Amino acid sequence: MEITNVTEYDAIAKAKLPKMVYDYYASGAEDQWTLQENRNAFARILFRPRILIDVNKIDMATTVLGFKISMPIMVAPTAFQKMAHPDGEYATARAASAAGTIMTLSSWATSSVEEVASTGPGIRFFQLYVYKNRKVVEQLVRRAEKAGFKAIALTVDTPRLGRRESDIKNRFTLPPNLTLKNFEGLDLGKMDEANDSGLASYVAGQIDRTLSWKDIQWLQTITNMPILVKGVLTGEDARIAIQAGAAGIIVSNHGARQLDYVPATISALEEVVKATQGRVPVFLDGGVRRGTDVFKALALGASGIFIGRPVVFALAAEGEAGVKKVLQMLRDEFELTMALSGCRSLSEITRNHIVTEWDTPRHLPRL
C-alpha cells in the first residue's frame, strides 16, 4: 500500500519497533494534553485563499541564518536515532542533505558530530544542553564547530526532564549496543542515579539546573556559531533572548515532553513573533504533519519549521528512503498549499491568508 502522508509512518513504526523504543519517541509528558494540542491547534486555523493569481511557478527557497535552503522545512534534533534504524543519524543527515535542507543533530545522538559530517556535504546545526561541567560543553561545541556545523540550537526548556510516564512504566534504557557517541571520551564525572524517566542514568543527570540567561552570553565567548534559543513560549522570554544575543528563536515545547498544559507551539508563535519585532528569525517545531501546517506557521510569522517525530518514524519504517519521502511529501503538500492559497513565494504568505480562533471578526477593506 502506497504511503500518501507523513502520519501513516507512525503506525508502521509502532508495529516495527519494540514498545519501549516506540513509546520513548511517541509519548509526551504526564496527561499528554499538550501532545494532542500540538496537533489539534493547527486544525483550528483556517485558510483565506486568494484566487485567480498566476501560480504556475512556485518558489519555496529561503535562507536561514544566511544559509540557502530549498524549503522552510528542516529536521529537528531527536535523540537516539539508531534505536529506530541501524543507520540512525547517518540516514537522516543524508536525507536532509538530498532535500537541500538543514538537519539539527541531537547532542544525545547515537552518531557523533564527526560521523555525521562524514556523510557528505550539508548544512547542519548542533543541539546542545548545558551541563554542570562546562568543560564538557566547551568540548562538544568545539567538536561541532570543527566538524563543520553551522549553528547551535540551545535547548532551554529542560532544567529537569519532564515526567514521561510510559518511559517510567517501560523502565526505558538505551539498548546496550548503543552509546551517546558525542560523549565518548569526555569526563562526565559521577552520573546521578535518579528515576525521572529512567533516562537519568545517562547524561540527563548532568544537565545544569542553574542554567540562566548569562550562560547564553558565556556560550558566545566560546564559539562564533550563531545560537538559536530553543524552547521559548512567551513574548517576555523572546525579548530577553534577543538581549542575551540569540541569533534566532525556536518556539518549542520539546514535543510536549516537558511541561504538560503549555500551549501548542502554533498557538504561542504569534506572541513570540510580535515580541521580536523582526529583529531575529523565529522558527517553530511541534505538531507539523502537513504542508498546510507549514503554511499556517509561516502565515503567523515563522521563518521556517522543524519536524521531529515524523523523521524518526519514517526512519524506523524505511530508513533513509523514508526520511527522504517525509521531506518530499511535506514539500509537495506545502507547494500545493501555496498554489491553492495564491502565493508564489514565501514573501507572499501573509497573516491575511489565515484566520485563527483568536482573530476578531474582520471588517474587510474597501476595494
From Swiss-Prot:
One of its GO terms (cellular component) is peroxisome. Its cofactor is FMN. Glyoxylate binds at residues 24, 129, 164, 254, 257. PROSITE patterns: FMN_HYDROXY_ACID_DH_1, FMN_HYDROXY_ACID_DH_2. The active site is at 254 (proton acceptor). It catalyses: glycolate + O2 = glyoxylate + H2O2; a (2S)-2-hydroxycarboxylate + O2 = a 2-oxocarboxylate + H2O2; (S)-lactate + O2 = pyruvate + H2O2. FMN binds at residues 77-79, 106, 127-129, 155, 230, 252, 285-289, 308-309. The modification N-acetylmethionine is found at residue 1. Its main location: other. GO terms for molecular function: (S)-2-hydroxy-acid oxidase activity; FMN binding. Residues 1-359 form the FMN hydroxy acid dehydrogenase domain. It is found in: Peroxisome. Its EC number is 1.1.3.15. It is an enzyme of class 1 (oxidoreductase). It comes from the Eukaryota. Belongs to the FMN-dependent alpha-hydroxy acid dehydrogenase family. PANTHER family: GLYCOLATE OXIDASE 2, S -2-HYDROXY-ACID OXIDASE-RELATED. Homotetramer. This is Glycolate oxidase 2. The gene is GLO2.
